[in-house]
Amino acid sequence: MELKQKYIITRNREIIVFPEMIQHSDFSDWEPISAGFISFGVNKDGNPTCSCHGRSISLGLDSRPEQETLIAKLQLNMMDY
């Protein structure tokens, strides 16, 4: 099962994850530099993992999938070793 949420990346390279029902633009005061969607799941070894993708229409910001997936995995302690 995959769980999809939204996120923003702040200028301090921190990820803020929130439910899909909330608009990205609700976080505009945080001065996001990118935004999109994050999917959570389980990898082939049974460990939690995540993946960032998409864009925010309400903020007009794209995601940077590879960079932001790494940021998310580091901050959420989901590194694939």
Residue locations for each model-derived region?
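Intrinsic low-complexity, intrinsically disordered or marginally ordered coil/linker segments
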Residues: M1-Y81
